[in-house]
Amino acid sequence: METENDTMVTEFIILGLTDSATLRAILFVFFLPVYIVTVVGNISIILLIRSSPQLHTPMYLFLSHLAFVDIGYSTSVTPIMLISFLREETTIPLAGCAAQLGSDVAFGTTECFLLATMAYDRYVAICSPLLYSTQMSPAICCFLLGASYLGGCMNASSFTGCFVNLNFCGPNKVNHFFCDLFPLVKLSCGHAYIAEISPSISSASVLVSTLSTIIVSYIYILHSILRMRSAEGRNKAFSTCTSHLTAVTLFYGTVLFVYVMPKSSYSADQVKVASVVYTVVIPMLNPLIYSLRNKEVKEAMKKLMARTHWFP
């Protein structure tokens, strides 16, 4: 005879950011415009790069893909968060949870690889400008993009594979605002050792490899900039790197806080806040960071507006 404890879970209840009805209403009013700005801003970056011949370079090719990934990253998480603000109880089936987990990890991991690729692109442009056209040829750019997306899919398969092999027969309330693996592992019954270790290893390898690439690239970039005799050349080199460094610092700072810091050093609410930053806020900020601090993007924007008669 089947007991209550043997009943398998078929859906999860997402607890969200808060259980206060007033605060949920305030957060909905705040985060809905954030999501709209994220989608509109990143689509605008993609269209601007596609329609501006002067931006048809590897650097802006990678930026357009970063904008696409940011749309996917935010969309994998934000809609269900907005729904949780409007409902007392937000439920999601196991299949939906697996899909959200997979898409979130895939886009997040791809963003890591793209940020590393963009750092390598800046390294080649500043440290080996005469070899730039050969070392960043269309074939190599396509390879780097393909590898970034493949890496995202492989890491996502590690997470979703562990999730689908978990058994859930007890509590089904996820203490998060989306289906993240580690809160889900806490709800599983039976042995979950592999589900804890395997994703941690794959995520650590992604973070270490991409962050190492970024750090090494910028060490060489800084060395090359300091050797430049022209102040104008140094300023131009710094300006091309500042926006990327800002995006890297914001993204990796919050991701490392969530996935690297010892779990005992922070609370579940602190994890939620950090997760909001890197999944919801940063995808909105990236178009602003790369457009407001980039002369070429601003010039392309002015030319596009002039062509469409938006301003003289």
Curated annotation (Swiss-Prot):
Indicate the segments annotated as coiled coil, or none if absent: none
Which InterPro entries does UniProt cross-reference here? GPCR_Rhodpsn, GPCR_Rhodpsn_7TM, Olfact_rcpt
What's the source species for this entry?
Mus musculus
The alphabetized UniProt keywords are:
Cell membrane, Disulfide bond, G-protein coupled receptor, Glycoprotein, Membrane, Olfaction, Receptor, Sensory transduction, Transducer, Transmembrane, Transmembrane helix
* A Pfam cross-reference name: 7tm_4
A molecular function (GO) held by this record is:
G protein-coupled receptor activity
Q: Give the subcellular location.
A: Cell membrane
Q: How does it sit in the membrane?
A: Multi-pass membrane protein
Q: What is this protein called?
A: Olfactory receptor 5P4
Q: What cellular-component terms does GO give this entry?
A: membrane; plasma membrane
Q: Which domain of life is it from?
A: Eukaryota
What family name appears in the similarity comment? Belongs to the G-protein coupled receptor 1 family.
Q: Glycosylation annotated at which residues?
A: 5
Which stretches are Cytoplasmic in the membrane topology? Answer: 47-54, 121-133, 218-237, 293-312
Give the transmembrane region(s): 26-46, 55-75, 100-120, 134-154, 197-217, 238-258, 272-292
> What job does this protein perform?
Potential odorant receptor.
Which is a GO BP term held by this UniProt record? Answer: G protein-coupled receptor signaling pathway
Q: List the disulfide bonds.
A: 97-189
Q: Which residues lie on this side of the membrane: Extracellular?
A: 1-25, 76-99, 155-196, 259-271
Q: What is the lineage of its organism?
A: Eukaryota, Metazoa, Chordata, Craniata, Vertebrata
